[in-house]
Amino acid sequence: MPKLLLNMEVKDWDVFNKTYVLGDNTNRENAGIKKIFIGHEEDKPNKVHAIFDIPHTNAMREYMDNPKAKQMAQESGIKFETLFGVVCKD
């Protein structure tokens, strides 16, 4: 299964954690996206790194086409201009 590695900055870790990390597991899992890890750098709490199992390369893009997912991402405080992702395969 491919892995998606994401790096981003968020406005506030606590808001991001509550809204995105803890609050959207069901929607991600319904899209076949399984969270492996989401956390922040030890000395930079607004610098976030994430790893997901994804069923195919475009899974996260398709998931973000969902209006509820888009709204949740915006409310979580992701700074989209800093978002970088790469799909890896083993």
Task: Mark where each language-model region is.
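Short S/T/G/P-rich N-terminal loop/turn motif that feeds into the first structured element of a domain
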Residues: 1-90
